[in-house]
């Protein structure tokens, strides 16, 4: 048997729609995997009752099929489904890394990314790598069709998860089909700023680079209290605030000493909007780990 821990992730980060992603130190999924004649899955943990154990309907089953690596896989969910924190990606990433090791497939971490992305497509409907890439490789990632660029970073973050469900499919439904050139230019500049900030480990630059005027405003309408929470986080010291992935998690970049105040402010703001929430004081960290 092999045990794998794969982290939650934050995709998009505002200006990097479908391209940027970051691994979070917490929360995480833990998978226990052992060889078998056919793939079977057991799911426990956060939101497990909403996750199918049928291998044909579960991300890890698709990964096992792609690697020709049948196994009994126990998934302990630490990342809530429909949270905007890459829940299905964490399981797919852990399965890819664990099965690659267990069956001695010899694939690199980067080579595992498209396999895990195909697995995640079972849930999200499309093979996007912006979550699986950082969950496998760690740090900050830029996922393109021709490969992944990865940068180690340790930017402090607060991820505030409200008790609201926003599915990836619903969130994609509000994405504009086109945008004014002025907005596109602004977002390109912000994305470049964020990438430089990651390379420099500079929370101020990362926060500035999170600004987005195309996708985020549309998705914000799906999150009750978003603008109030964003303002509260900024007033408490956040350098930037945006929606994590498809939402509803709201993520704030900050300096390390401000995380507690920001987390408290975001929780209070959601509470004022009548929404219960949980805050993770975290940071950009490692990818999937074998035990």
From Swiss-Prot:
<feature type="binding site">
    <location>
        <begin position="80"/>
        <end position="90"/>
    </location>
    <ligand>
        <name>ATP</name>
    </ligand>
</feature>
<dbReference type="GO" id="GO:0004413">
    <property type="term" value="F:homoserine kinase activity"/>
</dbReference>
<keyword id="KW-0028">Amino-acid biosynthesis</keyword>
<dbReference type="GO" id="GO:0005737">
    <property type="term" value="C:cytoplasm"/>
</dbReference>
<keyword id="KW-0808">Transferase</keyword>
<dbReference type="InterPro" id="IPR006204">
    <property type="entry name" value="GHMP_kinase_N_dom"/>
</dbReference>
<keyword id="KW-0418">Kinase</keyword>
<protein>
    <recommendedName>
        <fullName>Homoserine kinase</fullName>
        <ecNumber>2.7.1.39</ecNumber>
    </recommendedName>
</protein>
<comment type="pathway">
    <text>Amino-acid biosynthesis; L-threonine biosynthesis; L-threonine from L-aspartate: step 4/5.</text>
</comment>
<keyword id="KW-0067">ATP-binding</keyword>
<keyword id="KW-0963">Cytoplasm</keyword>
<dbReference type="Pfam" id="PF08544">
    <property type="entry name" value="GHMP_kinases_C"/>
</dbReference>
<dbReference type="Pfam" id="PF00288">
    <property type="entry name" value="GHMP_kinases_N"/>
</dbReference>
<dbReference type="InterPro" id="IPR014721">
    <property type="entry name" value="Ribsml_uS5_D2-typ_fold_subgr"/>
</dbReference>
<dbReference type="GO" id="GO:0009088">
    <property type="term" value="P:threonine biosynthetic process"/>
</dbReference>
<keyword id="KW-0547">Nucleotide-binding</keyword>
<dbReference type="GO" id="GO:0005524">
    <property type="term" value="F:ATP binding"/>
</dbReference>
<comment type="similarity">
    <text>Belongs to the GHMP kinase family. Homoserine kinase subfamily.</text>
</comment>
<dbReference type="InterPro" id="IPR013750">
    <property type="entry name" value="GHMP_kinase_C_dom"/>
</dbReference>
<dbReference type="InterPro" id="IPR036554">
    <property type="entry name" value="GHMP_kinase_C_sf"/>
</dbReference>
<comment type="function">
    <text>Catalyzes the ATP-dependent phosphorylation of L-homoserine to L-homoserine phosphate.</text>
</comment>
<keyword id="KW-0791">Threonine biosynthesis</keyword>
<dbReference type="InterPro" id="IPR000870">
    <property type="entry name" value="Homoserine_kinase"/>
</dbReference>
<dbReference type="InterPro" id="IPR020568">
    <property type="entry name" value="Ribosomal_Su5_D2-typ_SF"/>
</dbReference>
């Amino acid at each position: 048997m092999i045990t794998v821990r794969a982290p939650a992730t934050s995709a998009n980060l505002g200006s990097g729609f479908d391209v940027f992603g970051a691994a979070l130190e917490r929360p995480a999924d833990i998978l226990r995997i052992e060889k078998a004649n056919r793939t079977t899955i057991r799911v426990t943990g956060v939101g497990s009752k909403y996750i199918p154990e049928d291998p044909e309907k579960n991300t890890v089953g698709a990964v096992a099929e792609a690697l020709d690596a049948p196994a009994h896989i126990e998934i302990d969910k630490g990342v809530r489904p429909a949270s905007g924190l890459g829940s299905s990606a964490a399981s797919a990433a852990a399965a890819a890394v664990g099965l690659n090791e267990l069956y001695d497939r010899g694939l690199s971490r980067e080579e595992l990314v498209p396999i895990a992305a195909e697995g995640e497509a079972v849930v999200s409907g499309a093979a996007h790598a912006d979550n699986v890439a950082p969950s496998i490789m760690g740090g900050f990632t830029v996922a393109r069709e021709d490969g992944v660029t990865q940068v180690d970073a340790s930017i402090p973050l607060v991820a505030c998860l409200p008790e609201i469900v926003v599915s990836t499919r619903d969130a994609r439904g509000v994405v504009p089909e086109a945008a004014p050139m002025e907005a596109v230019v602004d977002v390109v500049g912000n994305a470049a700023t964020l990438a430089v900030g990651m390379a420099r480990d500079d929370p101020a630059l990362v926060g500035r680079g999170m600004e987005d005027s195309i996708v985020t405003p549309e998705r914000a309408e799906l999150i009750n209290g978003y603008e109030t929470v964003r303002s509260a986080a900024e007033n408490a010291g956040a350098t930037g605030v945006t929606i994590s992935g498809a939402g509803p998690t709201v993520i704030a970049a900050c300096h390390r000493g401000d995380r507690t105040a920001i987390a408290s402010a975001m929780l209070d703001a959601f509470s004022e909007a009548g929404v219960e929430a949980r805050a993770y004081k975290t940071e950009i960290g490692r990818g999937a780990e074998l035990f």
